[in-house]
Structure formats: C-alpha cells, structure tokens
Amino acid sequence: MADAQELIEVAAEVRQIICDLAEAPEIVQSARDGVRVAEDRLSRAEAAAYLESSGTVREREAHVTVHVAGLRDDVEVAKAALQYARDKSKSLETRLSGLQTLAGLLKTEMKL
C-alpha cells in the first residue's frame, strides 16, 4: 500500500525535474551557439588554409584537410554536445510524465 512518504519522494523528484527543465532551453541554446561558433571557426580556417597553400586543387584541398582537422573535431564535439542537451531534455520530459502518472496512482491507492 502506498504511503505519504512515497508520494513526498515522487513530488520532490518532480520538483527537481521541473527545475532542470526550466534550465534546459538555455542549455540547448548555448549548445547551438557552440556549434555555430565552431562551424564559423572551421569555415574561416578552411578559407585561410586554402589561400596560404599552393599547388593543384587536390594539393590545396589536402593541405586544408590536414590543417583544419582539429577544428573539424571541435565541430563534431559541439554537435554531440547539442544532441546530448536535446536528448537530456527529452529524457527529463519523459521521466516527468512517468512520475506524474506514478503520483496519480499513489494518490488513488491512498484513497482506497
């Protein structure tokens, strides 16, 4: 049989998730900004590397590839951070929904 303590624990977790969800849009936006900045740096570095190289088009492209590899990694890391932030937000929403259902069931059980 459900008791008040279980309901209190569920309510506390719901409050925490609501607080986390309130911060989620800022976290996602910050991650989006990180992707934009990383892509901008990569684009500028590619242009600069191409201009400072010489030779055939293939040689220039190879030069660019070598010189901006780290920045490409930075873009991928930024994209992964954005995806993580989105997934975390969805996970919190799902957990909140489950806890709200559980709270309703506990309340009903307590009334019986």
Set out the residue ranges of the language-model regions.
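Long amphipathic alpha-helical coiled-coil segments
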Residues: 28, 32-35, 39, 75-106
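Short, glycine/alanine-rich amphipathic alpha-helical segment
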Residues: 54-81
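A periodicity- and composition-biased signal for non-globular, repetitive helical segments
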Residues: 47, 64-66, 94, 101
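Short acidic DE-rich linear segments
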Residues: 1-2, 108-112
